[in-house]
């Protein structure tokens, strides 16, 4: 291969990184995260049963889906691995809200992010719209996990 050849690679945002990582079920704690039925969840309750006649101690997880708020449960042997989602929270400045429910956000490097909808939480949507319409300088927190993103919090950083 000669030096004059150039190779162009398409950039992918996640660079092929795994959306989850394994963790032993017995070490997952309340307020941690877990994947149940292929959904990223926050653990609200963990209970363990003792080893029985046939096998392992078991962990019973009760968790809430971090994007749609649904309650999910799972029972896993405590010595087995379960999937834990990579959950990230990023703050963006709100620039605009479009008629069709999408938001324009300003990233830390000065670019705009236009692919996010308003959240499903009605009270949060009302706070965002009210603050935006009254000209406040708003910063939204976007939570992302397993290829999904959603606005989960709002901060007023003062008047524009």
Swiss-Prot record:
One of its GO terms (biological process) is translational elongation. Residues 1-13 have a biased composition (Basic and acidic residues). Lys-53 undergoes hypusination, a unique post-translational modification that consists in the addition of a butylamino group from spermidine to lysine side chain, leading to the formation of the unusual amino acid hypusine. eIF-5As are the only known proteins to undergo this modification, which is essential for their function. Residues 1-22 are annotated as: Disordered. It comes from the Eukaryota. Keywords: Hypusine, Initiation factor, Protein biosynthesis. InterPro entries: IF5A-like, IF5A-like_N, NA-bd_OB-fold, Rib_uL2_dom2, Trans_elong_IF5A_hypusine_site, Transl_elong_IF5A_C, Translation_prot_SH3-like_sf. The modification Hypusine is found at residue 53. Pfam families: eIF-5a, IF5A-like_N. GO terms for molecular function: ribosome binding; RNA binding; translation elongation factor activity; translation initiation factor activity. PANTHER family: TRANSLATION INITIATION FACTOR 5A FAMILY MEMBER. Translation factor that promotes translation elongation and termination, particularly upon ribosome stalling at specific amino acid sequence contexts. Binds between the exit (E) and peptidyl (P) site of the ribosome and promotes rescue of stalled ribosome: specifically required for efficient translation of polyproline-containing peptides as well as other motifs that stall the ribosome. Acts as a ribosome quality control (RQC) cofactor by joining the RQC complex to facilitate peptidyl transfer during CAT tailing step. Belongs to the eIF-5A family. This is Eukaryotic translation initiation factor 5A. It comes from Zea mays. The gene is TIF5A.
């Amino acid at each position: 291969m000669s030096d004059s050849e150039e190779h162009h690679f398409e950039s992918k945002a996640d660079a092929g990184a795994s959306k989850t990582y394994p963790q032993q079920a017995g070490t997952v704690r309340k307020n941690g995260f877990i994947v149940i039925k292929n959904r990223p969840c926050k653990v609200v309750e963990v209970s363990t049963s003792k080893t029985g006649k046939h096998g392992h101690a078991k962990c019973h997880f009760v968790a809430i889906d971090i994007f749609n708020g649904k309650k999910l449960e799972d029972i896993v042997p405590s010595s087995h691995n379960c999937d834990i989602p990579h959950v990230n929270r990023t703050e963006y400045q709100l620039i605009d809200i479009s008629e069709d429910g999408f938001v324009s956000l300003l990233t830390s490097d000065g670019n705009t992010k236009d692919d996010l909808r308003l959240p499903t939480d009605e009270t949060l949507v009302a706070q965002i719209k009210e603050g935006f319409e009254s000209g406040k300088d708003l910063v939204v927190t976007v939570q992302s996990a397993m290829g999904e993103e959603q606005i989960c919090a709002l901060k007023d950083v003062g008047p524009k």
